[in-house]
Every structure is written in C-alpha cells, then in structure tokens.
Amino acid sequence: MLTIENLNQSYGQSHILHNISFTAPEKACTCIIGRNGVGKTTLLKAVMGQVAAQAATLKYGNIDLLKQRPEKRPYHGIAYVPQGRQIFSQLTVEDNLKIGLPVHNKRSNERTRNVPEMIYELFPVLFDMKQRRGGDLSGGQQQQLAIGRALVLNPGLLILDEPTEGIQPNIVDDITKVIRRLNQEWGLTVLVVEQKLHLINLLADHFVLIERGHCVAKGKGDELTEELIQTYLSV
C-alpha cells in the first residue's frame, strides 16, 4: 500500500500541490484523474523523488520513501513509467529492457541477467522485435517497451503516467488488458494517471481527483459520480 499524507510541492514561488493525502490500497488499481495541468504528473514525480516535496508521510508498505534516494526507490519494489517513455532510440529493444536490470559488475557495468520471459509473454511484439532499435518502434510499441522495462525488477507497485496517450486504439486495448492482468491476476498495486473516462471506468478500483493541486474527491471507482465528472473532468 502506498500512503501519502499532507504532501506539498512547489516550483519556486508557485505552490503546485497542496496537502495531498490518499492511500493506494495493495493489489488495487488507483486512478489519478483531473484536467491537464492540475498537478497529476508532479504528484507521481514527487512519489519517485524526481521533484522535491514535503510530506508528513510518504510510505510504500513499511518503507519511508522520504528517506530513500530517488535511484534507490525502484529497488524497493516501485516501478515508474513516465510520460514520454524515455526509450533509448539507438539501443535494441532487448538492451532497452536490460537497462532496467541491476548491474552485477559495477566496474564493467555488466548486466548479466536475461530479460524475464514474462515480459515477452505480456508483450509478444517485443520478442519479435528484440534486435530492432528502440527508435524504429511505433509510439504504441515504445510504450509497451517502457512498461516492459519497468517490470523487469518484478515490482509490487507499478506507477504509470498516461500510458495510453497518443497511441493507436488497438494498442490502447492491448496495454489496458495488460494493466488489468497485472493488477487482477498478478496482484500488482497500480497507480495510474489516466484521462480517458472509459478507461478510468474500466481500470479504477479507487480514484483520486485533483483540481488545481488540491485533492477535491476520492473514493471507490463506482463512486465517481456524473456530477464530479461534469464539474472537474468535462472540457
């Protein structure tokens, strides 16, 4: 379970997140929702330590994330798929996946473990294209690669920032099915920023609604009312 209490984040004089508090229950999917520019991505970056933030509590299970350096957080079972995918375009698909593996020989920077077979089972296209360069993949294939890379350390918490943004519909369906499978069959805790209402309805066991850096509503997925949708999500 991810527990956040009174999290605040500022850029200079701009206060971006205001006393955000919620829990992402274990083995459930929690959707962070809200219009563009309300602080959703900043919230995920704060959890991963990529932006400075202040909080009374920021814990994953019994691990105090406030005491963990950003580069150490993945080794405590937290995987993060950011916006933009951050694929290495000149590396092969296989080498992009291996980037997520721990270094066994620090002097040679050697990664001796193989890519877990379950990655290729989840995303068969990555096996078919594992010797192709990451830059040769379509946007949807790159997103599958980014998710696969996040999974190589077998995390307990998977954090995704708009994983279906700008992707062709057939791959959106594939990615959504994988997220549901990881959550429902494999028992991963999932925290996902999502904008598409039909996917929120499909994925969300719980939701957290952000508006101008404030948490204005939260609850179980079926408690996301039409009034909340019209007030905070409609364009």
Where are each of the predicted segments found?
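Conserved ABC ATPase signature
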Residues: R133-L137
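Catalytic Walker B motif of ABC-type/P-loop ATPase nucleotide-binding domains
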Residues: L158-E162
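ABC ATPase C-loop
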Residues: A150-L151
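Helix-to-loop junction immediately C-terminal to a conserved catalytic motif
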Residues: M48
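ABC-type ATPase nucleotide-binding domains, specifically the catalytic core motifs of the NBD
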Residues: G12, Q68, V93-N114, L122-P124, ...
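The feature captures the beta-strand-to-loop junction immediately N-terminal to the Walker
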Residues: I33-R35
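Conserved ABC transporter NBD signature motif
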Residues: A56-D64, H76, T112-P116, G219
